[in-house]
Swiss-Prot record:
Name of the featured protein: Porin Omp2b
Free-text note on domains in this protein's UniProt record: Consists of 16-stranded beta-barrel sheets, with large surface-exposed loops, that form a transmembrane pore at the center of each barrel. The pore is partially ocluded by a peptide loop that folds into the pore lumen.
Signal peptide per UniProt: 1-22
Record's function text: Forms passive diffusion pores that allow small molecular weight hydrophilic materials across the outer membrane.
Lineage: Bacteria, Pseudomonadati, Pseudomonadota, Alphaproteobacteria, Hyphomicrobiales
Subunit: Homotrimer.
GO molecular function: porin activity
Other remarks on this protein: The pore formed by Omp2a is larger than the one formed by Omp2b. Omp2b pores have optimal permeability to allow growth and protection against harmful compounds. The larger pore formed by Omp2a may be advantageous for intracellular growth, when the bacterium is competing with the host cell for nutrients whose concentration is particularly low within the phagosome.
Topological category with respect to the lipid bilayer: Multi-pass membrane protein
GO terms classed as biological process: monoatomic ion transport
Amino acid sequence: MNIKSLLLGSAAALVAASGAQAADAIVAPEPEAVEYVRVCDAYGAGYFYIPGTETCLRVHGYVRYDVKGGDDVYSGTDRNGWDKSARFALRVSTGSETELGTLKTFTELRFNYAANNSGVDGKYGNETSSGTVMEFAYIQLGGLRVGIDESEFHTFTGYLGDVINDDVISAGSYRTGKISYTFTGGNGFSAVIALEQGGDNDGGYTGTTNYRIDGYMPDVVGGLKYAGGWGSIAGVVAYDSVIEEWAAKVRGDVNITDQFSVWLQGAYSSAATPDQNYGQWGGDWAVWGGLKYQATQKAAFNLQAAHDDWGKTAVTANVAYELVPGFTVTPEVSYTKFGGEWKNTVAEDNAWGGIVRFQRSF
């Protein structure tokens, strides 16, 4: 075999091997198109489509830090120092359209921490507490809502004023399990009917935290409302199935100008005791009122006053100032006069308290 034959044989072998490798080569697939997150503006700002679905999702919430001093205007006791508390609230909202109407969900988890001097004796005197609570978790289809929410006795009339210490004179329990249906007409009228489990707080009067039903019979709430450009008027009636008593509230709101609004609310309870789920003011009746003045784009002034049948009077004022978009600082001053039948339940007749709230909402 000469050199020429050897070179020709080697070349032939290389060509054969290359052909075999080419036959076995793996062809890489074409890269799939990337599906970017799409903005969903059907339900307000902050929503986006969950990839691969027509469901819109929003993640939002707030971080809050409160510093309190002076008296506790709910109980009339001296704090003996600063009370501090922090909260992180994580909210998740979803929405999509169906043949039966808009399908929504809302959940809120609250992570709380508090360091309080109130009622603590000792060299350092700080008592700390922390906890996590599922504050809201409900499903809504059209006007039907089921899950954990706040009572329609509060929400349908619009709560109270835009102050922090708004429920020194309590207007009822908040969180409850419920099944409700809200009808909204095109002419400003709306109506609600709700079957509720009962609440788990009473505004701090008795220390009782359980006003939930003890059998199959639910609490029942019904309400009517009319809203227009001038303001609104709403009324609700609630039946407490545990004590077999009822309570009612009527509220009116008036927009005097684009910057200035006032409101007034009156309530009556057949049970005449705060130790119940709905009528948690003292005695037969209570009245609340307030105003809001939007002084500038950044600053709003709020005032609220309340009085009940047993002789408690509560007044609160604050200024909510938006330092930068999403970050609001709110200094607030409150006063409570414990008169009449309330006088014997507290150590001091008069309580002055202050609070500064720092809140970042997102």
